[in-house]
Regions:
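A cross-family structural signal marking well-folded subdomains
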Residues: 1-97
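Conserved aromatic-histidine-acidic binding/catalytic patches
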Residues: 4-8, 114, 161
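Generic recognition of well-ordered alpha-helical segments
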Residues: 15, 171-175
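Short, well-ordered loop/turn and helix-capping segments at boundaries between secondary-structure elements
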Residues: 22-26, 132, 161, 178
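Extended hydrophobic-aromatic, low-complexity segments
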Residues: 25-32, 87, 98-105, 135, ...
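Short, charged surface segments at domain edges that flank catalytic/cofactor-binding sites
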Residues: 93-140, 163
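Histidine-centered nuclease catalytic patch
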Residues: 120, 126, 137-172, 182
Length: 182
């Protein structure tokens, strides 16, 4: 929920909270877990679409419900079309009447100068790009893992003959290990 310049994006945060609330109420957490990795990749690569939604509604407080609908649209498209790649999902989103105004083409406005210094913003983007590559992923849902809330899981389950060796352990999301996997 941070921009590539490291600033907090309140609209994204509120929109995601509402989205999660709705999928819990609709008992669709397992659906979300199934597509979580691709969902997170999409949000990372197309974060500028959320900025466009906020701009349309002029402030985060007015935009967050639309951002929640945007997240739900992504989830539904990924579930219905699990063979589409992220760019194809972006093209499908703008077929939805509510999101036709979004410009989904990735545009590179970077000005490159020989012997030029990195701006503060570019430095932050380089850090983010580097750190995101190194974030571990949950082997069950392929979503990013937080260092603060993980579960240690048996790769081969105990009931299937799995042992307690280090080689038979993996870090997962708590939900993936305790609820989704079972």
């Amino acid at each position: 929920f941070y921009s590539d310049l490291g600033k907090h994006k309140i609209g994204s945060y509120y929109g995601f909270l509402l989205f999660i609330k709705l999928i819990i109420e609709q008992k669709r957490l397992n659906d979300f877990t199934r597509i979580r990795g691709t969902f997170e990749d999409f949000i990372y690569q197309y974060s500028f679409l959320i900025q466009q939604i906020v701009r349309k509604y002029r402030q985060s407080k007015k935009a967050y419900e639309h951002i929640s609908k945007f997240y739900k649209c992504i989830m539904d498209l990924l579930i219905e079309n699990n063979n589409l790649d992220i760019a194809q999902i972006a093209k499908e989103i703008i077929k939805n009447e509510e999101f036709m105004y979004l410009k989904v083409d990735l545009v590179d406005n970077e000005e490159v100068q020989i012997k030029g210094n990195f701006s503060r913003g570019k430095k932050q983007q380089i850090k983010l790009k580097t750190f995101v590559k190194s974030i571990p992923r949950c082997p069950i849902c392929n979503g990013y893992l937080s260092t603060k809330s993980t579960s240690v899981d048996h790769i081969q389950r105990k009931r299937d003959g799995g042992n307690n060796s280090i080689d038979n352990g993996q870090l997962t999301h708590i939900y993936c290990n305790t609820t989704y996997k079972n």
